[in-house]
């Protein structure tokens, strides 16, 4: 990447190509407490099993969350319209999924927010939120509130709080997700009857969801 950057800089200097910097202004839309009951929160698809459970945890804390469907080529093509193709592939998919959902007409832009994780470190995942901000603005959705999930206080929103109940249920969701992922992917290639592993997984997924809803630790430990 550094070699590519140096080559581009040398080419620009050789051909005397200079571009005036374009100032990008951005007003941060707020996600307020009142929006909890009125807004649908869109989340990009990153881990199908885990996010299905996290959706349940969010619901029990009063947030109406919708997880985007599995990624396909159309989401990638949509993302490339608003994100430079030299960013990491998950960022392209993430922006594409969200913009595609907003353009679908299934969600009212005035009653829709977006949630995304943010690492807050040196990883590019820290920049997913700014990329999404720019992508939504370019796509014609500058007023969509963005909620950042992180542990260092970046981009706080007054209407999204980490309550003890939410954190407990989220932790249960992640542990259940890891467990399901390990046992399902380990056994599915060797199933005797095609589809039987998925059927068993779906049964226990519903049991796990019920446990996340009631937050019963005795049931969880058993």
Residue map of PLM features:
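An N-terminal assembly and electron-transfer interface module characteristic of large anaerobic redox
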Residues: 1-222
